[in-house]
Amino acid sequence: AHSYNTDPEMVVTGKVLDSTHKEAMLWDIERGIPDRPQEKPWQTCTCIGGWHYGVKDYNAGYKSAQQVVDMLVDIVSKNGNLLLSIPLKGDGTHDDKEMRFIAEMTDWMEQNGRSIYGTRVWKTFGEGPLVDASNPIYNQGFNEGINYSAKDVRYVVKHARTEQDVDTVFATI
């Protein structure tokens, strides 16, 4: 209670929450995404490779920017937030593949950020093969690796700010 009284905008996260816990805490799904929109806001935490920097991850390759974009769009359409980790090398720098990933994500966000920031769940979150597919979350998450396709569409809405404006629905493929 002290923390909330000190900073009412503070967010406390938890991994395994029941409906009562979700009234006070933000559900944090590790490396996973629910298959349906959630009534309460939630987040997934993931990384482009392993949680810690390693040459093995560098050699194996990281998630592509397109994979993370697909995840981000799916997460936002289900009332979620993406917490993305890009590990640093021991000297505090990023490697060349991480820098390329960051540049590609930056380009996508500059072009499409309007469909992410300030948006809300629309009356339907999506269409396509993955809408009907079951992808259960195990324990606290760990259901990453969904293969999105061009047939998977996700929807969000940005509500009008004034009475003269209209709501904008974004469909991302």
Kindly give the residue locations of the regions a language model identified.
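Mature catalytic domains of secreted/periplasmic carbohydrate-active enzymes
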Residues: 1-173
